[in-house]
Swiss-Prot record:
InterPro entries: Ade_phspho_trans, Adenine_PRTase, PRibTrfase_dom, PRTase-like. This is Adenine phosphoribosyltransferase. Its EC number is 2.4.2.7. Keywords: Cytoplasm, Glycosyltransferase, Purine salvage, Transferase. The gene is apt. It catalyses: AMP + diphosphate = 5-phospho-alpha-D-ribose 1-diphosphate + adenine. GO terms for cellular component: cytoplasm. Its main location: cytoplasm. It is found in: Cytoplasm. CDD domains: PRTases_typeI. It is an enzyme of class 2 (transferase). It comes from the Bacteria. The lineage of its organism: Bacteria, Bacillati, Bacillota, Tissierellia, Tissierellales. The keyword Glycosyltransferase applies. GO terms for molecular function: adenine phosphoribosyltransferase activity.
Length: 172
């Protein structure tokens, strides 16, 4: 199955000059969705992973399914103020300001081997922040797994010290 054929491309959304990759068409095709998850699972199954971490919101769509299939814990990585109780946070720079990500303080165990799963690798800033947050709390990043990679945006460059696998690549 060619996953790229299952992703709708919408030029000019959300604004001119953007070519939006709409994964809802893939999600609405049960065979394509299962195939994408199975490919991620196959890539990760022999890496000794103890947990999957995924940033909200679309990362949850793949991360939780992969965690379930591998029989490992799922760690939701959220925006500030979305998790009750004690959290650990990591701030990172954006082009025009800063942003922050949080996890429950007890979600990551020292020595955990964590794979980060998300729908899209673009500039790599968000996944890099997730990695730093996991490492700050004693986890080890074993892999980064994505449905889509926008290769021209250089997300691999700032994450070059991590293993990265992507299922579909676009230049832009």
């Amino acid at each position: 199955m060619e996953l790229k054929e299952k992703i709708r491309v919408i030029d000019g959304f959300p604004k001119e000059g953007i070519s939006f990759k709409d994964i809802t068409t893939l999600l609405n095709d049960k065979d394509a969705y299962k195939y994408a998850v199975d490919l991620m699972v196959d890539d990760l199954k022999d890496k000794g992973i103890t947990a999957i971490a995924a940033p909200e919101a679309r990362g949850f769509l793949f991360g939780s399914a992969v965690a379930y299939a591998l029989g490992v814990r799922f760690i939701p990585v959220r925006k500030p103020g979305k998790l009750p109780g004690e959290v650990s946070e990591y701030s990172y720079d954006l082009e025009y300001g800063t942003d922050k990500l949080e996890v429950h303080r007890d979600a990551i165990k020292k020595g955990d081997k964590v794979a980060i799963v998300d729908d899209l690798l673009a500039t790599g800033g968000t996944v890099n922040a997730v990695a730093k947050l996991i490492e700050k709390n004693g986890g080890e990043i074993t892999a980064m797994e994505f449905l889509i990679e926008l290769t021209e945006l250089g997300g691999r460059d700032i994450n070059k010290n991590y293993y990265i696998n992507t299922l579909v690549q676009y230049e832009s």
